[in-house]
C-alpha cells in the first residue's frame, strides 16, 4: 500500500481500525478484540477519520478510547476489509476499514468507553475465528510482526 495520507483521500464510508497485538513470552502472538456496542460481536477497535490526524494516528486514538490501549500504530496499513454497518445505521450499507498494526505497550486505567465493551486477548487463530468479516480473518491470519 502507498504511504500514509490525511483523510481527504478516504471515502465517506471508510473507517480506520487498529490490529492491537502483543507477543507472549512463548513467542506466540495475541490479538486484542473488543465487542461492538450494538451487536456484541468481536471486532478490532475502529472509528471514523479525525480531522488533522493521519490514518494510523486516528486508529491509535480509537484503540485508546475504546479499549484503553496504549501504543503507537504503524504508519502503513496491513490492508483493508469490507463489512456491513451495524443495524442502528444501515445494515445493507457496505463500509471498509483500513487496519493498522499497533503493538500494545500498556493499558490506561481510565478511558472514554470503559465498561461499554468487553476487551479480550485471543490467540491469532482464535481472533481470526471470532471476527465475522472474511477480509479481516485473512489479515489476522497473515499478520506477522516480523514483516513490519
Please tell me what each predicted stretch does.
Residues 1-24:
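Acidic, metal-coordinating catalytic segment for phosphate/diphosphate chemistry
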Residues 24-30, 89-92:
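Short, solvent-exposed loop/turn segments that connect beta-strands within catalytic domains
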Residues 26-70:
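Conserved Nudix-box catalytic region and its N-terminal flanking loop in Nudix hydrolases
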Residues 43, 94, 121:
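Short aromatic/basic micro-patch
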Residues 68-108:
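Active-site segment of metal-dependent pyrophosphate-handling enzymes
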Residues 97-141:
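NUDIX/MutT-family hydrolases
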